[in-house]
Amino acid sequence: MPDFTRFIEAETLKPHLGDANLKIIDISIPQVYKEGHIPGAVHLSYPKIVHAHDDVDCDIPPDDVLSIALSEIGLRPEHHVVIYDSQHNPMASRLCWTLEEIEHKHFSIVNGGWHGWKDTGLPVETEINIPDVSTYKVCQTGRCNATTEYIKSKLDDPNVVILDTRLDEEYTNELLITDRGGMIPGAVHLDWMVNINENDHYRLYPDDVLMENFAKIGVVPEKEIIVYCQTHFRSAHTYQVLKHLGFNHVRGYAAGYSEWGNATDTPIENEFIDDD
């Protein structure tokens, strides 16, 4: 297999369709996959790679649950996994984050996702591809995930930047989703969509633009960066962008603000509770 980058261009992927150790995964909603997908792609349902419990919407599942999900799509350790979705790649990014957390070695995201492929006139198929089931063993490392306790331990660390990637309205409490609005103390804010060029098939902006977006808010490579949103859906995309840019010390908060904002013992800046 060639040495694909973290974000792969659709035209770069095209000549490798059918390569033996290439596994293309469409993690869009099932109906989108049925209507058309990259030739050879198998479908993976997003709910299979997240775990709801208590007030948490999308934590990382236990090892045995992840093992079943990845085995069902025939994943093997030697596969280079190429992933995309139809919603500008947050689901694809969450799966890539999960693969990195379990130390799967080779993975990429299609730059622009499904739009980056089909809107540029590349071939599309509608055949439902049924994979041969594998036995894929999962062991989480904890190196990519920031737990609530981990974040609490870093709140006063000057070498750590906590990055909130939610909508402006969530950050400012105009939109309240959890019991307690607000933000993790000290967090800086950058809406995850700022890095995506809607006029270029939802591909990423050039690297210099991306770096400037982050530098303006103090997100620099020398720091450890912890990214979060409500469910580590949008923040997973920002995680991938940071890794693409060469940031080596990045973690994602899998349980997200759905855990932090529904807990009773977490510190919150600009806390807001709607009593109506």
What do the PLM-derived regions correspond to, one by one?
Residues M1-E35, N89, N111-D179, I268, ...:
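Flexible, polar/low-complexity N-terminal or interdomain linker segments that lie immediately upstream
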Residues L13, A41, L99, W117, ...:
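Terminal peptide-recognition signature
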Residues H51-H80, M193-I225:
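Helix-loop module immediately N-terminal to the HCX5R catalytic loop
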Residues C58-K154, E174-L175, G182, R234-R251, ...:
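Thiolate-centered catalytic microenvironments shared by cysteine-dependent enzyme domains
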Residues D156, I162-Y205, N213:
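A mid-sequence, solvent-exposed acidic-amphipathic segment
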Residues I226-V227, L245, D265:
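C-terminal soluble interaction/assembly domains
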Residues R251-D276:
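Cysteine-dependent PTP/DSP-like catalytic domain, specifically the C-terminal lobe
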